[in-house]
Amino acid sequence: MKPLFLQIKCELGQTFKVAADFIDTVKETSEVYSTSGAYDLLGKFYLEEDQNVGRFVVEHIHRIPGIRDTYTLMAFRIFCDEQPDGLVERG
C-alpha cells in the first residue's frame, strides 16, 4: 500500500460534511483532520501499489460535493518508532 496525503479546501460551511463524505464513501480513507491555514482538511489515504494517483483523485475525491481545491502530497517513507513491517527506520 502506498500512502497519499491530500490537503482539501472546502466551500464555506461544508468542511464537516466533506470530511464525513470521505469517511462514508472513499474506502481508501485512513484519517481526515480539520486544519488551520490555507486548507480546511488533511486526508490520509492508502492506495494499492498499482493504483493510479491522478485517477484516484479525479474519480474519488473531486466528485465529492463541497470541495473547492485539493493539493496532493505523495509520501515515500514513514519514520517512526515501529514500522508496519516491524523494521525501525532511523537515518
Regions found by a protein language model. Give the residues of each.
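A compositional/biophysical signature of low hydrophobicity enriched in polar/charged and small residues
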Residues: 1-91
